[in-house]
Amino acid sequence: MKLHQFLVFLFLFLSCFALSSWALPLCSDSRAPSEVNSTLSFCPYKGKTCCNTMKDTSLMKQFQAMNISDKGCASVVKSILCANCDPFSSDLFRDNSDQQSVPILCNSTSSANSTENFCSETWETCQNVSISGSLFAASLQGRAGAPSNKNASKLADLWQSKTDFCSAFGGASSNETVCFSGEPVALNDNDTTPDKPPSGICLEKIGNGSYLNMVPHPDGSNRAFFSTQPGIVFLAGIPDQDSGGVLDVDPSSPFVDMTDEIHFDTEFGMMGMAFHPKFAQNGRFFASFNCDKSKWPGCTGRCSCNSDVNCDPSKLTPDSGSQPCQYQTVIAEYTANSTSSDPSKAKNAKPTEVRRIFTMGLPFTSHHAGQILFGPDGYLYFMMGDGGGGADPYNFAQNKKSLLGKIMRLDVDNIPSASEISKMGLWGNYSIPKDNPFREDKELEPEIWAVGLRNPWRCSFDSSRPSYFMCADVGQDTYEEVDLISKGGNYGWRVYEGPDLFHPESSPGGNTSVKSLNPIFPVMGYNHSEVDSSGKSASITGGYFYRSETDPCIAGRYVYADLYGNGVWAGIETPANSGSFVTKRTTFSCASDSPMKCSDSPGTSGLSLGYVFSFGEDNNKDIYLLTSNGVYRVVRPSRCNLTCSKENSTARRNPGTSSSPSSSSSSCYKHINGFHGSLVVLFVSLSLILLGLLN
């Protein structure tokens, strides 16, 4: 390998580690910061913080027990303890172990871009001060550096030098991470003006089929799975951008046909599908669908209206002629192994269930969502609506013992025995992840990840920032919302609809007190009146953060739409990493050279999308709209004569080249974790050695 070739490779490799922005207001336990009415009595935090009064008092007692006589050192140690309350504590403690209690201390020697050196200040202020039960003992820290005396109480006795101390506790602040400088983390918000909104979004039509779900093939190829609401899954080849091609799909040869088990009508059907992260090796995939127990003996599950949630099915009014829990929501596992020794090459699968993961009877005939997806953590997330009935009359979304109106998080890799499943009261063949927020809380169901949703319709993880888990939630009367989902978060329904209090006309299931909630309000959304003057026809469809290179003018924006095709929005976080978004409705149009003719809106020259059922994302991070009029893909703005100063026409993908996910920033991201900086340092060290060998 030539030296210049190696340097290019090294640069490209390292650039992977500088793509993602990690900071987000999030606590070290992955929960969202909560609002406190006044400044905490010990730690100087107010507003949204990661400490309540109990935690604040606990930190104060811990500090007092240290018995620090030097005022300067006491002030430093107090600030370090109180970093636990910082709204960005998840990032401050990003290398956290179960015992670690010290945030990453800003250390200017770690980065040429950092001007802070709080780590050195801590050493110089406290090195000769006795600290009982020191936070800085290496046995607690578990990082590099060997203490000279583990039983000592002074830093100078615990650590051999300032260099060793800051090697273990120091770090830098950058676009990707934050470090603790002795003060609450403050975002660089000198410029809070977002980039100019896009002049519009250009689409091309590449398929006529009407699909509800799209999942890119886990092998990273330019293929994707598309499923219809009746329950047929197709494996399709995706054409390169600018190639003039269309979806390569054979309607007569589906990947799998599940229609025999699925009950389909306007509200029911196959609502979601997910492929195991290791599908290319194990062939496992999952479907979420509805069944009718009056027509299929395999449709058996416990009713969600039961005594545990203070609900009596016999007292529910039949809905559209159906009986309570006649219809069930199901997650089932299937395999592609039976049709191919190499699952990544399988072109079809058998519709025979390998395992029933989850079954639950539905009280009414609407608001059951049903999307499933694997998160970056490898667990299966299951989105469930409030069960319907109009205004959630039984308040299921806030009921702690109900799984309705919740997002669930399940482990489908470690399946308990039948006796264990029965003992734990699970709804099927799965286990509970150890870090689920309510695993040890007897008042709430352990499957729950988040509560207070009405009908979450399409959620996604940002492929560049796994802590950004976005869900659109369909509103009742006035507001459609996008929520930034966090561990244990309560999103307000039906105490709130969007940011406003909601007042149900009747509530046989009781009410939840406003004062008992700590709601997390939407980060984006729109009023019904924005898309329909009558205020009635509106229903949000969640999308994705746009991470493709195709349209640089919407890069980094979260794109979502209204079901009725009346609007598409693009939201951008302002300032960066704040969790606050500015969103704007944008126009959409069809490329003049679209491979398939787009549908025109009656009486106009504009594009008619029909119903926007879902969004999709391929392995190149290009975004698709799955509509009743076909499959549309976001393409270069110039193909619609839209102005985008960032578009470089010379950097277009070459038609006919392989669409490899390795060209995508997210492919680099898959291999990055909390200690990515250490990996970079290691790689650089190895690179220097290799350069010496090459020369």
Swiss-Prot record:
Name of this chain's protein: HIPL1 protein
Lineage: superkingdom: Eukaryota
PANTHER family: HEDGEHOG-INTERACTING PROTEIN, HIPL1 PROTEIN
InterPro entries: 6-blade_b-propeller_TolB-like, Glc/Sorbosone_DH, Quinoprot_gluc/sorb_DH_b-prop
Gene name for this UniProt entry: HIPL1
Subcellular location: Cell membrane
Gene3D superfamilies: TolB, C-terminal domain
Annotated glycosylation sites: 37, 67, 107, 113, 128, 151, 175, 190, 208, 337, 429, 511, 527, 641, 648
Cofactor: pyrroloquinoline quinone
